[in-house]
A protein has these predicted regions:
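C-terminal cap/loop subdomain of S1 sulfatases and analogous C-terminal strand-loop tails that border
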Residues: 92, 131, 138-197
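Active-site-proximal cap/lid insertion segments
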Residues: 1-131, 135-145, 188-197
Length: 197
């Protein structure tokens, strides 16, 4: 069992520099080809920030390829389940927000003999489901106190109807937002409606 945290897409890497030193390479992304989400202003700075994030994603993708290559070289690729989940990005409405841009992020599972390559599944899962899923794949009984539910393996649970999200703290500020989503709709409750967002 191993966990690799590729943090290049973390919020701290979206800035051009910190303390006068560059912290991310100039992105080789075509700024004009970037689709700016409708909730961002259409400015060169926003395009540069999005391009930097995409360049950081490409970096993580290359690093993941190296890790998968090492598994293959060691003869472990066909006997190893691999899960890749992503950061929700550093931009507003992503980091710390229960909007789709903050909670709908890719989860990729590679399980030789268990998942056919190219399979796409649309069920609602959450990162709290990873621990029970790993236990299920290992044939281990899932303790009652563990939150989440297995989505693969012999102890996979029936597909859930809802997922939940929350926003409580942003640095020194408190913000109370709750969300519940099914496959069609999301309800967001903001407990501080006096806030301008």
């Amino acid at each position: 069992f191993a966990v690799f945290n590729l943090t290049r897409t973390h919020e701290s890497n979206m800035w051009e520099q910190m303390d006068g030193e560059p912290i991310a390479p100039d992105p080789a992304v075509d700024l004009e080809a970037i689709e700016v989400p409708p909730y961002f202003p259409e400015t060169p700075k926003v395009r540069q920030s999005l391009a930097r994030n995409y360049a950081n994603i490409e970096y993580n993708d290359r690093r993941l390829g190296e890790i998968l290559g090492e598994l293959a070289e060691d003869g472990l690729a066909e006997n190893t389940a691999v899960f890749v989940w992503t950061d929700h990005g550093p931009m507003p409405r992503g980091k710390r927000w229960p909007h789709d841009s903050g909670i709908r992020s890719p989860l990729i599972a590679r399980w030789p003999g268990g998942i056919a390559p190219g399979t796409v599944r649309e069920e609602l899962v959450s990162t709290i489901d990873l621990a029970p899923t790993v236990l299920s794949l290992c044939g281990v009984e899932i303790p009652q106190h563990i939150q989440g539910q297995a989505f693969l393996g012999p102890r996979a649970a029936p597909e859930r109807e809802y997922v939940y999200a929350a926003r409580d703290r942003y640095d020194e500020m408190y913000d109370t937002v709750r969300a519940v989503r099914d496959k069609r709709f999301k309800y967001i409750r903001h407990y501080h409606p006096e806030q301008p967002y």
